[in-house]
């Protein structure tokens, strides 16, 4: 077991009850193009077209053969583009339940499939896009093979669902998915789970189980990769979400594309935080209708630390998100707030009274409690960074745009979510995730 000592479990109110309920009927779903790093789409449909679930909507020009398929049947109601015609979203108005059938196999045949068969099946169904590389967090190039594959069967994000509750309902499909993944690598398939949890064991010795304990980010796949299979420019691993492993298992044994998604709807502005069964790319306005407290709320696809805020073109459940978080928009001004004791404000430092109430849960809002200023190294970053990385030095070099030094300090091991806690505790209010992405893109382009 690997024990994580550094980190932070955010004391936020509104944790979900770990019970699964059916969510409301969803009338619009979307694929969000900006979730796929470096992807350039070649559109295969246009507005007004009728599509079936599993039908290809667009192909990646940079990776021919990588198809992005419809998560539901219906009509293409909008194709939204941003600056320089960057694809933002493809919106589908859900109608009926027609779907593309796929070839399927008996459970005992899965272990005999070739890697070419598995890759072809994943590519044509669109489930290949559930895989991501580390470094760079991109969709893998068809034909490539990773040193290992990681599945995080634990989640330490604030307000997250317990993955074991979800996996327990589909344990057979989960194990079938693991069998399929073993055909894609000569290395290990690492299943990482929380210490003390009962996990259904796979009989294939290629599948290994690793226990992690401690505060967030103990549940992040970046943490697991760092301790088990550190990456570099010459060593690449893949990772995939546990619900996508279930979908892969169902694809190969049933011949259908499963786009179900169980998410935690939680946060201080949710009336009854709970786990909801919905569908991939679901409209957030439809998913949260009638379930929120009155007021000006911010709906976030994903975690409050690293998720994506609701907007007109991004108001849908993200491909890689397992939760929907809702907090209050902090638009009001506070007179002399900087001299108040701050009983209801949380801080990692001893600057507010809230710091001393260890068991208190706080109704966090979007307030930043101050403006941007110079980066101040007072030890906050080191307190929440469990990886063997010089946090302050790395963050400084990221802000300075020093790619050589950032690479030497370990930035290739990181994704935006790995620096979310550094952003949260930063006295200078810097957003380190986008800065990291710019540096990674530059490193990749320069080779």
Swiss-Prot record:
Swiss-Prot/TrEMBL keywords: Ion transport, NAD, Sodium, Sodium transport, Translocase, Transport, Ubiquinone
Superkingdom of this protein's organism: Bacteria
GO molecular function, one term: oxidoreductase activity, acting on NAD(P)H, quinone or similar compound as acceptor
Family matches, as InterPro entries: NqrA (IPR008703), NQRA_2nd (IPR056148), NqrA_C_domain (IPR022615), NQRA_N (IPR056147)
Enzyme class at the top of the EC tree: translocase
EC number assigned by the record: 7.2.1.1
Catalytic activity: a ubiquinone + n Na(+)(in) + NADH + H(+) = a ubiquinol + n Na(+)(out) + NAD(+)
GO terms, biological process: sodium ion transport
Chain coiled-coil ranges: none
Pfam families per UniProt: NQRA_2nd (PF24836), NQRA_N (PF05896), NQRA_SLBB (PF11973)
Subunit structure of this chain's protein: Composed of six subunits; NqrA, NqrB, NqrC, NqrD, NqrE and NqrF.
Biological function: NQR complex catalyzes the reduction of ubiquinone-1 to ubiquinol by two successive reactions, coupled with the transport of Na(+) ions from the cytoplasm to the periplasm. NqrA to NqrE are probably involved in the second step, the conversion of ubisemiquinone to ubiquinol.
Cited NCBIfam families: nqrA (TIGR01936), PRK05352.1-2 (NF003759), PRK05352.1-4 (NF003761)
Family: Belongs to the NqrA family.
Name of the featured protein: Na(+)-translocating NADH-quinone reductase subunit A
Species name: Yersinia pseudotuberculosis serotype O:1b (strain IP 31758)
